[in-house]
A protein has these predicted regions:
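Short glycine-/acidic-enriched loop or helix-start segments at secondary-structure transitions
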Residues: 44, 93-95, 127
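Short His-Asn-centered micro-motif
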Residues: 12-14, 35, 84-87
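Glycine-rich phosphate-binding loop used to anchor ATP phosphates in small-molecule kinases
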Residues: 58-114
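Conserved GTP-binding G-domain of TRAFAC-class P-loop NTPases and closely related GTPase folds
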Residues: 2-12, 17-20, 29-31, 108-109, ...
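Conserved substrate/cofactor phosphate-moiety recognition/catalytic segment
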Residues: 20-80
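Short, glycine/charged-enriched secondary-structure capping and boundary segments
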Residues: 25-27, 47-48, 97-104, 129-132
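Conserved nucleotide-binding/hydrolysis micro-motifs of P-loop NTPases
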Residues: 37-39, 89, 119-124
Protein backbone atom coordinates (compact mmCIF):
# COMPACT_ATOMS: atom_id res chain seq x y z
CA UNK A 1 0.00 0.00 0.00
CA UNK A 2 1.06 3.55 -0.58
CA UNK A 3 0.22 6.20 1.98
CA UNK A 4 -0.12 9.94 1.66
CA UNK A 5 2.96 11.60 3.01
CA UNK A 6 2.88 14.35 5.60
CA UNK A 7 -0.06 12.77 7.43
CA UNK A 8 -0.30 11.93 11.15
CA UNK A 9 -3.18 9.64 12.11
CA UNK A 10 -3.90 9.52 15.85
CA UNK A 11 -5.83 6.48 17.10
CA UNK A 12 -8.29 7.26 19.90
CA UNK A 13 -10.17 4.72 21.99
CA UNK A 14 -10.32 2.64 25.14
CA UNK A 15 -7.75 -0.07 25.82
CA UNK A 16 -8.69 -3.21 23.83
CA UNK A 17 -10.99 -1.22 21.51
CA UNK A 18 -9.20 -2.44 18.36
CA UNK A 19 -6.55 0.23 17.72
CA UNK A 20 -3.54 -2.09 17.48
CA UNK A 21 -5.60 -4.64 15.55
CA UNK A 22 -6.48 -1.89 13.06
CA UNK A 23 -2.77 -1.10 12.67
CA UNK A 24 -1.93 -4.76 11.98
CA UNK A 25 -4.93 -5.38 9.70
CA UNK A 26 -4.09 -2.39 7.50
CA UNK A 27 -0.35 -3.10 7.30
CA UNK A 28 0.59 0.00 9.28
CA UNK A 29 2.92 -1.60 11.84
CA UNK A 30 6.11 -0.17 10.34
CA UNK A 31 4.55 3.29 10.23
CA UNK A 32 3.32 3.22 13.82
CA UNK A 33 4.61 4.89 16.97
CA UNK A 34 3.13 2.87 19.84
CA UNK A 35 2.98 4.50 23.26
CA UNK A 36 2.52 1.08 24.92
CA UNK A 37 5.65 -0.33 23.31
CA UNK A 38 7.71 2.70 24.30
CA UNK A 39 6.37 2.53 27.87
CA UNK A 40 7.23 -1.18 28.03
CA UNK A 41 10.79 -0.46 26.88
CA UNK A 42 11.23 2.12 29.65
CA UNK A 43 9.39 0.46 32.51
CA UNK A 44 9.62 -3.18 31.52
CA UNK A 45 6.82 -5.32 30.18
CA UNK A 46 3.71 -4.83 32.30
CA UNK A 47 5.63 -2.67 34.81
CA UNK A 48 2.43 -1.21 36.24
CA UNK A 49 1.13 -4.61 37.38
CA UNK A 50 4.24 -6.02 39.07
CA UNK A 51 2.70 -6.28 42.51
CA UNK A 52 -0.65 -7.73 41.53
CA UNK A 53 -2.33 -4.35 41.37
CA UNK A 54 -2.21 -1.32 39.12
CA UNK A 55 0.58 1.03 40.17
CA UNK A 56 1.40 3.76 37.67
CA UNK A 57 4.87 5.31 37.83
CA UNK A 58 4.58 8.96 36.75
CA UNK A 59 8.26 9.05 35.77
CA UNK A 60 7.80 6.13 33.37
CA UNK A 61 4.62 7.65 31.92
CA UNK A 62 6.26 11.07 31.47
CA UNK A 63 9.33 9.56 29.80
CA UNK A 64 7.16 7.41 27.50
CA UNK A 65 5.12 10.46 26.52
CA UNK A 66 8.22 12.54 25.78
CA UNK A 67 9.81 9.71 23.79
CA UNK A 68 6.60 9.19 21.80
CA UNK A 69 6.52 12.85 20.80
CA UNK A 70 10.23 12.75 20.00
CA UNK A 71 9.79 9.63 17.84
CA UNK A 72 6.93 11.31 15.96
CA UNK A 73 9.01 14.45 15.47
CA UNK A 74 11.96 12.43 14.13
CA UNK A 75 9.74 10.52 11.71
CA UNK A 76 8.19 13.76 10.51
CA UNK A 77 11.58 14.87 9.25
CA UNK A 78 11.27 12.21 6.54
CA UNK A 79 7.75 13.30 5.58
CA UNK A 80 6.41 9.77 5.98
CA UNK A 81 2.87 8.77 6.92
CA UNK A 82 2.73 8.16 10.71
CA UNK A 83 0.21 6.39 12.93
CA UNK A 84 0.21 7.21 16.66
CA UNK A 85 -1.24 4.27 18.61
CA UNK A 86 -2.24 5.60 22.02
CA UNK A 87 -5.52 5.47 23.93
CA UNK A 88 -5.73 9.26 24.41
CA UNK A 89 -8.58 8.63 26.89
CA UNK A 90 -7.88 11.78 28.86
CA UNK A 91 -9.78 14.55 30.60
CA UNK A 92 -10.76 17.21 28.05
CA UNK A 93 -8.12 19.76 29.10
CA UNK A 94 -5.33 17.16 28.92
CA UNK A 95 -6.61 15.87 25.56
CA UNK A 96 -6.65 19.43 24.22
CA UNK A 97 -3.04 19.95 25.34
CA UNK A 98 -1.92 16.63 23.85
CA UNK A 99 -3.50 17.45 20.49
CA UNK A 100 -2.03 20.97 20.62
CA UNK A 101 1.48 19.46 20.99
CA UNK A 102 0.82 17.18 18.03
CA UNK A 103 -0.66 20.07 16.02
CA UNK A 104 2.43 22.17 16.73
CA UNK A 105 4.64 19.34 15.46
CA UNK A 106 2.42 19.03 12.39
CA UNK A 107 2.69 22.77 11.71
CA UNK A 108 6.49 22.68 11.99
CA UNK A 109 6.79 19.72 9.60
CA UNK A 110 3.89 20.60 7.24
CA UNK A 111 1.75 17.64 8.31
CA UNK A 112 -2.01 17.17 8.43
CA UNK A 113 -3.42 15.86 11.72
CA UNK A 114 -6.20 13.26 11.63
CA UNK A 115 -7.81 11.04 14.25
CA UNK A 116 -9.67 7.77 14.10
CA UNK A 117 -12.12 7.13 16.94
CA UNK A 118 -12.75 3.57 18.14
CA UNK A 119 -16.20 3.52 19.76
CA UNK A 120 -16.09 -0.05 21.04
CA UNK A 121 -18.36 -0.44 24.08
CA UNK A 122 -16.66 -0.82 27.46
CA UNK A 123 -18.06 -4.32 28.07
CA UNK A 124 -16.43 -5.61 24.88
CA UNK A 125 -13.17 -3.88 25.81
CA UNK A 126 -13.22 -5.44 29.29
CA UNK A 127 -13.86 -8.89 27.80
CA UNK A 128 -11.06 -8.52 25.25
CA UNK A 129 -8.75 -7.14 27.90
CA UNK A 130 -9.27 -10.14 30.19
CA UNK A 131 -8.79 -12.56 27.29
CA UNK A 132 -5.52 -11.12 26.09
CA UNK A 133 -3.63 -10.71 29.35
CA UNK A 134 -3.87 -10.55 33.10
CA UNK A 135 -1.84 -7.34 32.83
CA UNK A 136 -4.62 -5.08 31.63
CA UNK A 137 -6.50 -2.19 33.21
CA UNK A 138 -8.94 -3.06 35.97
CA UNK A 139 -12.65 -2.55 35.42
CA UNK A 140 -12.50 0.54 37.63
CA UNK A 141 -9.69 2.08 35.57
CA UNK A 142 -11.40 1.15 32.29
CA UNK A 143 -14.67 2.76 33.40
CA UNK A 144 -12.81 5.94 34.42
CA UNK A 145 -11.20 6.06 30.98
CA UNK A 146 -14.59 5.43 29.38
CA UNK A 147 -16.03 8.43 31.22
CA UNK A 148 -13.24 10.66 29.87
CA UNK A 149 -13.55 9.17 26.38
CA UNK A 150 -17.35 9.49 26.11
CA UNK A 151 -17.35 13.06 27.42
CA UNK A 152 -14.38 14.37 25.45
CA UNK A 153 -14.32 15.90 21.99
CA UNK A 154 -11.33 16.23 19.75
CA UNK A 155 -10.37 19.85 19.16
CA UNK A 156 -11.73 21.21 15.89
CA UNK A 157 -8.25 21.52 14.36
CA UNK A 158 -7.95 17.70 14.26
CA UNK A 159 -9.68 16.18 11.24
CA UNK A 160 -11.97 13.18 11.72
CA UNK A 161 -10.82 10.32 9.51
CA UNK A 162 -14.11 8.42 9.74
CA UNK A 163 -16.45 11.25 8.76
CA UNK A 164 -14.28 13.30 6.48
CA UNK A 165 -15.38 11.73 3.22
CA UNK A 166 -11.66 11.60 2.46
CA UNK A 167 -10.97 8.07 1.29
CA UNK A 168 -7.61 8.89 -0.27
CA UNK A 169 -5.65 8.64 2.98
CA UNK A 170 -4.99 4.95 2.49
CA UNK A 171 -4.52 4.36 -1.22
CA UNK A 172 -3.81 1.10 -3.00
CA UNK A 173 -0.65 1.28 -5.02
CA UNK A 174 -1.29 1.01 -8.73
CA UNK A 175 0.89 -1.52 -10.57
Amino acid sequence: MEFNRHTLLVLWGLPASGKSTYVEKHGLTDLCVSYDQIRDIIGGKHYAFRYGKLVIDPDVERAAHQMSLYAISCRMRTGDFIVYDNTNTLPQDVLNQEMRWLKDLCDIHDYTLWYKRFDTDVETCLKRSKERSKYEPTEEVMRQQEMYFRNAQMPSFVRNFDYSGYDGLLQKKED
